[in-house]
Design a protein with these regions (language model features):
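Surface-exposed, charged secondary-structure patches
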Residues: 21-79, 138-169
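Core segments of small alpha/beta cavity-forming domains
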Residues: 1-25, 105-140
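Short beta-strand edge/turn micro-motifs at domain boundaries
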Residues: 75-104, 169
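Short, structured motif recognition centered on aromatic/hydrophobic residues
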Residues: 70, 83, 92, 114-117
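Residue-identity detector for glutamine
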Residues: 11, 27-28, 82, 86, ...
Length: 169
């Protein structure tokens, strides 16, 4: 998928045209001549992945998958844009783009919580576990992992960059 997003020529070759584009349940089609290269997540400094449960992390490297979706989740406008890929003859092909409200997402409550958490430091302070389990790499040896706990005031010194308005999945 990364190569698809990064390479304009490959992207056109690996998109099924006319491409089905469904917005709020209404289907349209994008012709190849109207396609604009979409970098997906490749221009971002990081990307996020949401899992329902820890075991779902194993799917990320599962070679037997035939379908996969990449999502842009727009936290501030409550929209999701899904890029649906299907493996055809061993090649990943973009088959559909679908855009709809996050209100239809099974994890809408989490998205609402996360948006408030990322954008409101008072809300963060109220919702950080006390103490917070913290796992990081050892600055003196990047192959070693440190496990400790943080107090709420330490959270603000060690917290990662949080997506404020949009995230990938």
């Amino acid at each position: 998928i990364y190569n698809y997003a990064a390479n304009e020529k490959l992207q056109k070759a690996r998109t099924v045209f006319p491409l089905s584009y469904i917005k709020d349940g209404e289907q349209q089609f994008i012709e190849e001549k109207n396609w604009e290269h979409d970098h997906l997540f490749t221009k971002e400094n990081y990307y996020t992945l949401l899992y329902d449960k820890e075991e779902d992390m194993d799917f990320e490297k599962n070679p037997s998958l035939d379908t996969v979706s990449v999502e842009w989740i727009y936290l501030d406008t409550h929209e999701i844009r899904q890029y649906h890929f299907q493996r055809k003859n061993g090649l990943w092909m973009l088959t559909t783009i679908e855009q709809h409200s996050t209100l239809e997402a099974p994890y809408e409550d989490f998205l609402e919580f996360f948006y408030k958490f990322a954008n409101d430091s008072i809300f963060q302070r109220e919702h950080v576990a006390r103490p917070l389990k913290f796992v990081t790499s050892d600055p003196d040896d990047e192959f070693q992992i440190l496990e400790t706990t943080l107090e709420v005031d330490q959270w603000f010194a060690f917290k990662p960059l949080l997506p404020l308005h949009k995230m990938t999945n």
